């Protein structure tokens, strides 16, 4: 099922770039691009205890964004052009040809000072 991005409203159609926020008792919020999740967290005034998740770009498996390896690629076109990619581990990143030339980004750049959990 293709969810709509909670930030830009585009369809979340490519699992390699997907992200989501979950909180107890709340509907999950889906994002088509890690840049959309970052922008939503910066703008949101919601105080729910959100946990941020990102799809591993290579395996499409969910992992906690706070523990993920994140990088920005100028060569990979992401849905909203952020260039942000995530992997569950450095080993997954190293096995992904799309990671070549990508520059590491600290998760705090996406999650903000609250670490994506509020």
What feature does the model see in each segment?
Residues 1-30, 34-118:
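Intrinsically disordered, low-complexity linkers and terminal regions
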